[in-house]
Amino acid sequence: MSVTYNKKKKRNVVVGVVHIHATYNNIIVTITDQQGHSLVSTSAGAYGFKGSKKATPYAAQETAGHAVKTVVEQNGMKTVSIKVSGPGAGREAAIRAVQACNLNVTSIKDTTKLPHNGCKLPGRRRV
């Protein structure tokens, strides 16, 4: 029987940032410390959601909840700020899942990038 040890030191991170990237096809949740070093990164596909089910609010809720519980157990996180980007359907569900994990949420910020009349959009699809 072989036992493998994680070579990365367990750090006690009390304050962190939850990055939620919600697209039309998937949701990606990354939890970092305040300097931006990644602690946990996961997506809806990692929890068994496939195809169009990855973009549902339920998948976003499960993904965010699992990621936050993992980082609380491993690093003892108590306070987070939330940054949400993307136009996906699971934005609010993921925020609610983070708030339900008994963490102190200091701020919720929308970092979705919007063009100020930049590049021309591609034409409509003709089938």
UniProtKB/Swiss-Prot annotation:
Q: Name one GO cellular component term.
A: ribosome
A Pfam family it matches: Ribosomal_S11
Keyword vocabulary terms for this entry:
Ribonucleoprotein, Ribosomal protein, RNA-binding, rRNA-binding
Which terms in the Gene Ontology molecular function aspect does this entry carry?
rRNA binding; structural constituent of ribosome
Superkingdom of the source species: Bacteria
The answer to whether UniProt assigns keyword Ribosomal protein to this entry is yes
Q: What are the BP-aspect GO terms?
A: translation
The yes or no answer to whether the keyword RNA-binding is present is yes
> Subunit info?
Part of the 30S ribosomal subunit. Interacts with proteins S7 and S18. Binds to IF-3.
Per the record, the similarity remark reads: Belongs to the universal ribosomal protein uS11 family.
State its role: Located on the platform of the 30S subunit, it bridges several disparate RNA helices of the 16S rRNA. Forms part of the Shine-Dalgarno cleft in the 70S ribosome.
Q: Which HAMAP family match?
A: Ribosomal_uS11
Q: What is this protein called?
A: Small ribosomal subunit protein uS11
Which source organism does the UniProt entry give? Ehrlichia ruminantium (strain Gardel)
Q: What is the lineage of its organism?
A: Bacteria, Pseudomonadati, Pseudomonadota, Alphaproteobacteria, Rickettsiales
Gene name, Swiss-Prot/TrEMBL: rpsK
